[in-house]
């Protein structure tokens, strides 16, 4: 199976999580970090889901899944403890051409959750195509050690420098040369030296 790696803009897009237990809550939390409009469907929910609903950060429908829950959804995650319920969610999504991820069931996934290293605006995603989530987690741990928190600050700095370069009247070649320079290992070393307290 060949997968297409992609980062999605989910801001204000309806994303439905079916199930309201710990796994579903973790999926909902990730969607909220992406500013999605999150709807959680499940008769019982974790305290976190209930708290987020009370604070207006997500919508919780305290009942079983119904096919019309996916109306106008951009994507759906099925994270119930019932394989029959997850299958019903998957079939409804397929019928309405809505992207679906059934947790721990690669055959019923239009997309997979990668293991992600987050350092501010820097995101490094690792996927094994559903073959070995444990390996993806191990690689994430290794990358977390390699790319410390300072990388987030450096990426923000590089982004600001890029804006300044784009405002200048430069040829494409000059612009590319400067971009390569500010994103080089030497640039990182200089950035780290400059940010150290005297």
Identify the function of each model-found stretch.
Residues 1-53:
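Hydrophobic, well-ordered beta-alpha structural blocks that scaffold small-molecule cofactor pockets
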Residues 51-71:
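Glycine-rich, highly charged phosphate/nucleotide-binding loops
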Residues 22-23, 83-84, 130:
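Residue-level detector of alpha-helix initiation sites
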Residues 130-198:
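An accessory alpha-helical subdomain
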Residues 42, 60-64, 104:
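Short loop/edge segments at beta-strand edges and connector loops
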Residues 102-152:
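E1/E1-like adenylate-forming module used to activate ubiquitin-like modifiers
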Residues 75-80, 86-113:
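ADP-ribose/adenylate-binding Rossmann-like module
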């Amino acid at each position: 199976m060949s997968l297409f790696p992609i980062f999605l803009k989910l801001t204000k897009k309806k994303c439905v999580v079916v199930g309201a237990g710990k796994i579903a809550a973790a999926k909902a939390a990730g969607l909220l970090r992406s500013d999605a409009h999150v709807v959680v469907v499940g008769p019982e929910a974790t305290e976190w889901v209930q708290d987020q609903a009370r604070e207006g950060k997500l919508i919780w429908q305290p009942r079983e899944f119904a096919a019309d829950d996916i109306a106008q959804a951009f994507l759906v995650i099925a994270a119930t403890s019932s394989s029959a319920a997850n299958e019903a969610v998957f079939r409804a999504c397929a019928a309405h051409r809505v992207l679906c991820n059934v947790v721990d069931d690669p055959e019923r996934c239009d997309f997979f959750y990668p293991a992600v290293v987050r350092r501010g605006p820097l995101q490094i995603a690792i996927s094994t195509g559903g073959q070995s989530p444990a390996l993806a987690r191990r690689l994430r741990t290794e990358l977390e050690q390699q790319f410390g928190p300072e990388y987030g600050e450096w990426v923000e700095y590089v982004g600001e420098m890029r804006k300044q370069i784009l405002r200048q009247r430069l040829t494409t070649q000059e612009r590319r040369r400067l971009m390569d320079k500010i994103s080089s290992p030497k640039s990182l070393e200089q950035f780290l030296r400059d940010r150290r307290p005297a």
